[in-house]
């Protein structure tokens, strides 16, 4: 699955959770791959399909997208996991992190 296919997959899954979802343009996305809306709140999402752990760059990108999209919340979603540095930076910036286990739980996926 390519990175863009992963973004499309997340679009479908978030819609099943009741979000309105906008998939941003592949280039010039200003740090967000998806823009979610639910209950009057806007959340920007950086999606990373990686075989290794996601580092701080993904968190930095999504934090940078908050102002551009006038978002209330931010999150990084990956099929993998996160480095300790990424977790620390996300915590400091109130960015929600969903790794493989969170995706399976939130989207009700059985291994």
Q: Where on the chain are the PLM-derived regions?
A:
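Mixed-charge (Asp/Glu-Lys/Arg
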Residues: 1-111
């Amino acid at each position: 699955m390519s990175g863009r296919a992963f973004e499309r997959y997340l679009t479908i899954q978030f819609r099943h959770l009741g979000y309105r979802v906008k998939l941003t343009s592949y280039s010039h996305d200003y740090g967000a791959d998806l823009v979610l809306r639910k209950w009057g709140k806007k959340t920007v999402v950086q999606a990373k399909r990686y075989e290794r752990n996601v580092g701080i760059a993904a968190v930095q990108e999504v934090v940078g997208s908050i102002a551009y999209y006038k978002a209330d919340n931010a999150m990084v979603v990956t099929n993998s996991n996160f480095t300790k540095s990424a977790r620390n930076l996300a915590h400091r910036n109130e960015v929600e992190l969903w790794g493989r286990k969170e995706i399976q739980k939130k989207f009700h996926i059985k291994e």
